């Protein structure tokens, strides 16, 4: 877990602004911080980095890393899974002075140029300054596991690992009415480059951005559709199955190979599949700790650490979300996940693993998830003005198969990018690093490619890799947590925030009477649309923190 920030341009007191930006990311790492400032074209460039050392095998090197011999400056947030293999390949051409992945990145760039990113297996957000060419490169991993945000103001470029770091530089903080309106009406999180904040963009997954001091240009160094076509054209079913099995084994080693203890959440199919793969391929005894979300009335199992979620925790976590969420949150699931991260940290863990990515392999998470661009809720809560701001999401269809098209949209545009952003910020706030080993390589592309050359459908061939007992990996039905959490303090918190929304700067977007009626119904234990209530609370949390 790391945080990177940067400024390029003619900025007054650049060093102080850079320090303020980094200070806003101090929760992402407390193992020291590094600053680097230099001239750039006709202005200046500055980068800073803070981090939390997770790996127990890799050398800790202060960043931004300055490679004087290659004239490259690098700052990275992420994990390079194959850095040892890349280092071995590069040793014939370069002399290494550290045993760190960041130096490998520097040498890899000098050897292969922009083509180096395609050789990397891992999750990363990278800022790399080529001093010979006077160009700044910014790159993001294949599926956008690691975040990267940027904005321009008065001809200057600002970038960072979280949106709050941009505001830390003194830039204006304003929500995007258009983006929030589209979320309220259509449930869309927006295109891959957009955010819920005015004038703030994110670098899309698999993208590479260049800045030469005068203009920004962007291209894709990775395209999943191109990789699927390449896999299908070059390999038959037997070869693809072998590649899939190898990728699953590799993913297991990414979980725990460089840490002494690692946490896993159980209760969902993807996480349980991780444990099955670990048992199948072996792991060091004592490395693994498992969690299960529960409430205070559940007896602790001997081999599972319960995640206590008491009514008092709910309000506490909701209050904290105001400072870290930066976009809509998902109610119960976000609260439980954040409590897991916090408890893992108290247990002394640096790393918690998730099975995100395996969902794509099974497909069930994305079954029937295509967006029909219609109102998702009765819109009597909203004023006609909201519909004028909201734009219907529209995505291209390059897949012949409709299921693949829907999966691709959720993978690259909607659900998965949102989940990854929430994972990143909530884990950073809690002080742990989340590993998503199934999104660092080629597993997702293989899950698309194999059905194209096989007589079996996706679920049929995936059954081969499931635990012997199918029942052991089925999601467990649980009673809703709302009745257990329905404390007076939670009702008061919700009533206060809905009232603030009805009186605030965006009240004209709502029918205020309907908004207050929803709040009253909730507090009086009457049925309400909880998803819609969470949307309104998410919006107010961001407004209330302005």
Which residues does each predicted region cover?
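Conserved glycosyltransferase catalytic-site signature
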Residues: 101-102, 121-123, 177, 333-338, ...
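Soluble or luminal CAZymes and related metallo-dependent hydrolases
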Residues: 240-244, 248, 332-336, 407, ...
């Amino acid at each position: 877990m790391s945080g990177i920030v940067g400024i390029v341009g003619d900025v007054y007191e650049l060093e102080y602004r850079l320090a303020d930006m980094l200070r806003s990311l101090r929760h992402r790492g407390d193992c020291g911080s590094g600053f680097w400032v230099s001239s750039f074209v006709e202005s200046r460039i500055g980068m800073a980095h803070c981090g939390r050392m997770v790996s127990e095998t890799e050398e800790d090197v202060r960043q931004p890393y300055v490679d004087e011999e290659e004239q490259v400056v690098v700052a990275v947030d992420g994990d390079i899974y194959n850095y040892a293999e890349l280092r071995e390949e590069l040793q014939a051409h370069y002399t290494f002075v550290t045993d760190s992945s960041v130096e490998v990145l520097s040498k890899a760039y000098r050897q292969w140029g922009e083509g180096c990113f395609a050789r990397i297996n891992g999750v990363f957000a990278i800022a790399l300054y080529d001093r010979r060419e006077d160009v700044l490169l910014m790159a993001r991993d294949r599926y956008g596991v690691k975040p990267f945000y940027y904005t321009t103001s008065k001809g200057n470029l600002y970038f960072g690992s979280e949106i709050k770091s941009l505001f830390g530089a003194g830039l204006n903080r304003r929500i995007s009415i258009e983006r929030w309106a589209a979320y309220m009406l259509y449930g869309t999180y927006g295109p891959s480059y957009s955010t819920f904040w005015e004038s703030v963009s994110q670098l899309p997954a698999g993208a590479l951005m260049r800045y030469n001091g005068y203009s920004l240009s962007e291209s894709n160094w990775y395209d999943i559709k191109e990789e699927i076509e390449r896999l299908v054209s070059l390999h038959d079913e037997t070869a693809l199955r072998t590649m899939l099995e190898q990728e699953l084994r590799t993913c297991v080693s990414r979980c725990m190979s460089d840490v002494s203890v690692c946490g896993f959440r159980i209760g969902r199919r993807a996480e349980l599949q991780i444990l099955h793969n670990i048992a199948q391929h072996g792991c060091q005894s004592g490395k693994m700790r498992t969690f299960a979300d529960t409430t205070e009335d559940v007896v602790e199992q001997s081999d599972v650490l319960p995640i206590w979620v008491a009514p008092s925790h709910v309000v506490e976590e909701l209050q904290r979300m105001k400072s870290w969420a930066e976009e809509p949150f998902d109610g119960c699931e976000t609260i439980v996940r954040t409590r897991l991260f916090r408890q893992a940290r108290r247990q002394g863990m640096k790393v918690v693993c998730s099975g995100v990515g395996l969902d794509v392999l099974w497909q069930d998470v994305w079954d029937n998830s295509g967006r029909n661009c219609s109102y998702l809720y009765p819109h009597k809560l909203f004023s006609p003005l909201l519909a004028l701001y909201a734009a219907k999401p529209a995505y291209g269809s390059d897949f012949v198969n409709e299921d693949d098209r829907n999966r691709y949209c959720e993978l690259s545009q909607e659900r998965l990018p949102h989940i990854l952003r929430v994972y990143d910020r909530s884990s950073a706030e809690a002080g742990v690093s989340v590993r998503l080993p199934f999104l660092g390589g080629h597993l997702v592309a293989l899950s698309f490619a194999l059905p194209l050359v096989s007589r079996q459908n996706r679920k049929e061939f995936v059954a081969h890799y499931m635990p012997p007992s199918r029942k052991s990996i089925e999601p467990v039905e649980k009673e809703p947590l709302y009745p257990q959490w329905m404390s007076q303090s939670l009702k008061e918190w919700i009533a206060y925030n809905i009232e603030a929304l009805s009186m605030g700067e965006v009240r004209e977007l709502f029918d205020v009477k309907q908004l207050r009626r929803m709040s009253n119904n909730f507090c009086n234990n009457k049925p309400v649309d909880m998803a819609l209530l969470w949307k309104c609370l998410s919006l107010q949390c961001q407004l209330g923190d302005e």
